[in-house]
Amino acid sequence: MTTFGTPLSPHATKVMLLGSGELGKEVLIALQRLGVETIATDRYDNAPGQQVAHHARTITMSDPAQLKSLIEKERPHLVVPEIEAIATAMLEELEAAGTVRVIPTARAARLTMDREGIRRLAAETLGLPTSPYVFCDSLQELQAAIDTNIGYPCIVKPVMSSSGKGQSKIAGPADVKTAWDYAMAGGRVSHGRVIVEGFIDFDYEITQLTVRALGADGQVETHFCEPIGHIQVSGDYVESWQPHPMREAALQKSRAIAKAVTDDLGGQGLFGVELFVKGDEVWFSEVSPRPHDTGMVTMCTQWQNEFELHARAILGLPVNTALKSSGASAVIYGGVDAKGIVFDGVADALRVPNTDIRLFGKPESFVKRRMGVALAFDADVEVARANAKLAASRVKPRVAKG
């Protein structure tokens, strides 16, 4: 796009997000700063992104009829999936009919909506290094795959879930049924199918944020952010930092893998490519065709954060992935199961040097629900990590009184 309209006018440039959580909220803000009219869609009312968008819509996004009806009614220029649980076959149908452009493409949305599509693409089509894996449809198949192929320890995940839900490590035979039951409970759209992966004894894991954006000649160029290190607990990110130190050979392999998979997915936008690293060896893990939770650290480390990069790239604008400072992020959990909670300690948190926080505005809290994030920058990334965790620890969510 080279011309942008005025929001809420007949010539507005309209973008619809499918999924409006904390990541979508920041994308919406970035789009609005560029004069875009925004439509925030989610499965529940008052989702974080709906609180800041021009228009809020609530539907079951995995229902093809509801999704088609909404897109045909709103007629956005772009549809931007921000979650996996979407009727992607309908997106492909609408894209093929010329009704809408899907970011990055409808095919990419379909392939990345579950772990099977993207793993088969990476390992079987592109030949990228991955952990050994088997897909299973029953507890019996899971046990057989472990016994004959994968071995112990191993990792079990639902084919579709988010934020690590349903993911667990199996140390031995006694853990298999528990892991299966947990995966069935944690799948976002349960089809009774899991992936079991051989355990890689990696040194660390990173997210390689990769941006496909138009260059001055109108051709797609690939840009890389500095690698983001992160720690996950049960598959859910709890802290991240940027940059993560890497050997040059490992860095180049990481970027080659990221480019291979994002080139195949195509389109424009930011992708979060997760990788395991041991020495100079690198294995592909997963990819999301959208901003990544570990990439929230870029709100304090880059001149253009991951949300601004995504917004610019999908609109056909130039991008800048340069780092401005080392930094870190740490998750603020809900700590309680309640609606409309309040947060104490915000001022104390912000007294930690060089810190900031984001409270997402989710209408309902759970003990382990991500309700905010603390950010910290420092020339020394380890100082930034310590400060981010300290700031996060000072924010105290609680049930509102009265």
UniProtKB/Swiss-Prot annotation:
Pathway where this protein functions: Purine metabolism; IMP biosynthesis via de novo pathway; N(2)-formyl-N(1)-(5-phospho-D-ribosyl)glycinamide from N(1)-(5-phospho-D-ribosyl)glycinamide (formate route): step 1/1
Domain ATP-grasp residue range list: 120-315
Residues reported in the UniProt entry to bind N(1)-(5-phospho-beta-D-ribosyl)glycinamide: E22, L23, E82, D293, K362, R369, R370
GO cellular component: cytosol
Any single Pfam family the record assigns to this protein: RS_preATP-grasp-like
Annotated positions binding Mg(2+): E274, E286
GO molecular function: ATP binding; magnesium ion binding; phosphoribosylglycinamide formyltransferase 2 activity; phosphoribosylglycinamide formyltransferase activity
Record InterPro entries: ATP-grasp, ATP-grasp_carboxylate-amine, ATP_grasp_subdomain_1, PreATP-grasp_dom_sf, PurT, PurT/PurK_preATP-grasp, PurT_C, Rudment_hybrid_motif
Catalytically driven reaction(s): N(1)-(5-phospho-beta-D-ribosyl)glycinamide + formate + ATP = N(2)-formyl-N(1)-(5-phospho-beta-D-ribosyl)glycinamide + ADP + phosphate + H(+)
Assembly behavior: Homodimer.
The protein's role, per its UniProt record: Involved in the de novo purine biosynthesis. Catalyzes the transfer of formate to 5-phospho-ribosyl-glycinamide (GAR), producing 5-phospho-ribosyl-N-formylglycinamide (FGAR). Formate is provided by PurU via hydrolysis of 10-formyl-tetrahydrofolate.
Protein family according to the UniProt entry: Belongs to the PurK/PurT family.
Protein name (database record): Formate-dependent phosphoribosylglycinamide formyltransferase
Gene, per the UniProt record: purT
